[in-house]
């Protein structure tokens, strides 16, 4: 999905109204990235006529899909288009109390030449798919802060659970789950 000026402006307004969370590594920029992902996800659900309740004020989940399905959106920004072997992360500092039924992952493509704080650097959003909490806990690779993943050179700033793109439930299957929630 191409990111419009209108969407970025809406995300900036939403991000500006949020507090900086204690464990936030990127602070205001983390809020902006998260808000872009949330708006993209909301538009995706609306386009596919999936009912949802916005609960982003909570740190336990971002949305209630249908009548009961709790879901949290995780958004990562990248300088290259996402590929099937790339990872999606769930930080562990929220994991004890953030126990949604599903996590949903969005990747943002950013243009490096525009600078680290220019909100217009985000050009595209990729809706990657999701994973149930049970599957995440079963298949994810745990990384501790300071560890380096030898497959891609990433050194983790916080403990997290990682799943590869190909471990996610595809969007068409998730839409069916969401519609039946």
Regions found by a protein language model. Name each.
Residues 1-66, 74-181:
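Nucleic-acid endonuclease domains
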């Amino acid at each position: 999905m191409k990111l419009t000026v209108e969407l970025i402006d809406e995300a900036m307004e939403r991000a500006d109204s949020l507090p900086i969370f204690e464990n936030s590594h990127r602070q205001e920029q983390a809020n902006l990235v998260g808000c872009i992902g949330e708006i993209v996800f909301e538009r995706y659900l609306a386009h596919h006529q999936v009912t949802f309740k916005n609960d982003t004020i909570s740190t336990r989940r971002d949305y209630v899909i249908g009548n009961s399905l709790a879901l949290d959106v995780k958004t990562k920004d990248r300088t290259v288009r996402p590929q099937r072997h790339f990872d999606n992360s769930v930080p562990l500092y929220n994991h004890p109390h953030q126990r949604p039924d599903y996590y949903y992952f969005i990747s943002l493509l950013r243009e490096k030449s525009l600078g680290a704080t220019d909100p217009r650097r985000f050009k595209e959003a990729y809706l990657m798919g999701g994973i149930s909490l049970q599957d995440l806990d079963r298949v994810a690779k745990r990384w501790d802060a300071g560890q380096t993943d030898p497959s891609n050179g990433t050194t983790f700033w916080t403990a997290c659970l990682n799943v590869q793109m190909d471990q996610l439930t595809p969007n068409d299957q998730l839409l069916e789950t969401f519609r039946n929630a």
